Amino acid sequence: WTKTKNIELIKNYSKWFGLRYELLYFYNVYGPGQILNTKMAAVIGIFENQFLKKKSLTIVKPGSQKRDFTHIDDIVTGCYLAWKKGRQSEYMLGTKKQYSIIEVAKMFKTKIRYIPSRKGERFKSSIINNNAYKHLGYSASIDIPNYIENFISKNNFS
């Protein structure tokens, strides 16, 4: 509800005061500088932190939850393209490819441990409108399997 009201307010400010805007939605952003170990950490940051500490990766049951993971460099590119076009529109920035949490955890090639499901856990998160591809020429160029493979090769201290 709050997000909807904020969007409504932004659009009204545009009408009332000529405010220029672009509304961008990000999907599970990962990459350099991400949060690794607080309540605000996303799944890739959590997995990286656990991997570096040689701990089992924790997966919220059932593990089949699907997400679209987007690298920060692709997000920055999408933001720039939206700013450059200046269409006063909404864009969803992602890869259009989903992976289950268990698939991502297995990419780290380490031990996995399941933890109980949480109330309110989303089962699926995906882009439902690809207007960023159509209107901005946006296309994600970094995929999560390659990112994780590079992360492991840089940080595998066996």
Label the model's feature ranges.
Residues V29-G33, I59-F69, Y91-Y99, S117-R122, ...:
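Glycine-rich Rossmann NAD(P)(H)-binding loop
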Residues I72, S100-E103, R118-N150:
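Conserved C-terminal active-site "lid" loop/helix of NAD(P)H-dependent oxidoreductases
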Residues Q34-K39:
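Short, solvent-exposed loop/turn segments at secondary-structure boundaries
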Residues G78-G120, N129:
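Mid/C-terminal beta-alpha module of Rossmann-like enzyme folds, strongest
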Residues E48, C79-W83, A105-F108, I144, ...:
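Hydrophobic "lid"/C-terminal helical patch
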Residues T2-K5:
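Active-site helix of classical SDR
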Residues I7-P32, T58, I112:
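Conserved beta-loop-beta element that borders a ligand/cofactor-binding pocket
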Residues F26-V29, G45-T58, K66-Y91:
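Alpha-helical substrate-binding/gating segment
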